[in-house]
């Protein structure tokens, strides 16, 4: 028997959430064929502070690329295609409740790049998240009691080849609505353009709770509007900046109609900044 040697190198990993409980390291050769994987436990992951972690990994000989996946187990069938033996990780999916505190993240790196001690591997959450606040200086007569996301994808892929450009959808996907209105950060699987929308539940002028529909569209340079894809690893921070009357009287009415006239919001994405989204049935909803 020949027991192959292992090459040791240090990988500094960075995530945008709070904790890495375990790390799965997958090895692929120059032709993207699967070579093997190992799992690193929490005890072997060194927290360097500032959302930076350091681990030592054993790299199988002939490895050209490492894929790193946090906080979930990866099966052999997810790691490699049965017939070709090549990387199948881009087809691996997860569904169900999302964990903001210990998120499933993915990243990849060329082994040659690890020869530099300064190399960092960036890990990306497989989901997006949204939150809602109001501008207290501009909005005095509006109490937000919660919000819900509608028609977001029910599942998502672990890895992606479209990180900065578009969503990576599973081969088949259903869409779902959140069950309850609440505040805080709501995680959701990345969703293609033209699908998802938000309903904010709030009290206007100390009146009863009413419902405001907010869609997601991007304003183009020519003034037209295009539905906006909601991408993984983005935080869509919605801030209400103006309200001039109550919303729809029921959730169903809000769902069945265009965004209600009179609610203006600013949306700040934790990657690029997008502003001046106006929820209004008299105009196209957009961001600019």
Put a short name on every predicted segment.
Residues 122-125:
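Interdomain boundary/hinge segments at the C-termini of tandem beta-sandwich modules
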Residues 238-240:
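Broad, structure-driven detector of short, well-ordered beta-strand segments within folded domains
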Residues 55-56, 116-120:
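Catalytic micro-motifs at enzyme active sites that drive phosphoryl/nucleotidyl and oxygen chemistry
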Residues 10-80, 129-232, 242, 246, ...:
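Tryptophan-paired
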Residues 1-5:
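Conserved aromatic anchor
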Residues 42, 75-118, 210-221:
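Structured interaction patches on ligand/partner-binding surfaces of diverse proteins
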Residues 242-287:
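Intrinsically disordered, low-complexity repeat and linker tracts
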Residues 226-236, 255-258:
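Intrinsically disordered, low-complexity segments enriched in small/polar residues
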């Amino acid at each position: 028997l020949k027991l192959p040697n292992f090459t040791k190198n240090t990988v500094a990993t960075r995530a945008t959430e709070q904790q890495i409980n375990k790390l799965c390291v997958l090895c692929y050769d120059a032709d993207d064929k699967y070579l093997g994987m190992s799992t690193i436990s929490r005890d072997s992951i060194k927290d360097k502070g500032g959302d930076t972690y350091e681990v030592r990994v054993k790299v199988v000989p002939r490895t050209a690329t490492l894929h790193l996946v946090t906080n979930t187990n990866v099966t052999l069938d997810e790691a490699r295609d049965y017939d070709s033996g090549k990387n199948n990780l881009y087809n691996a999916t997860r569904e169900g409740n999302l964990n903001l505190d210990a998120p499933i993240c993915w990243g990849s790196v060329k082994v040659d790049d690890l020869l530099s001690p300064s190399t960092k591997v960036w890990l990306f959450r497989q989901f997006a998240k949204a939150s809602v606040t109001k501008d207290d200086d501009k909005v005095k007569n509006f109490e937000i009691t919660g919000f819900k996301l509608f028609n977001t994808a029910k599942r998502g892929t672990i890895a992606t080849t479209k990180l900065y450009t578009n969503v990576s959808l599973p081969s088949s996907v259903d869409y779902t609505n959140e069950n309850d209105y609440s505040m805080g950060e709501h995680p959701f699987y990345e969703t293609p353009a033209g699908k998802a929308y938000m309903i904010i539940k709030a009290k206007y002028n100390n009146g009863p709770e009413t419902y405001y529909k907010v869609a997601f569209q991007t304003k183009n340079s020519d003034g037209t509007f295009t539905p906006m894809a909601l991408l993984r690893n983005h935080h869509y921070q919605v801030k209400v900046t103006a309200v001039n009357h109550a919303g729809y009287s029921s959730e169903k009415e809000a769902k069945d109609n265009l965004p209600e006239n009179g609610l203006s919001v600013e949306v700040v994405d934790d990657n690029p900044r997008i502003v001046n989204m106006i929820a209004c049935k008299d105009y196209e909803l957009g961001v600019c």
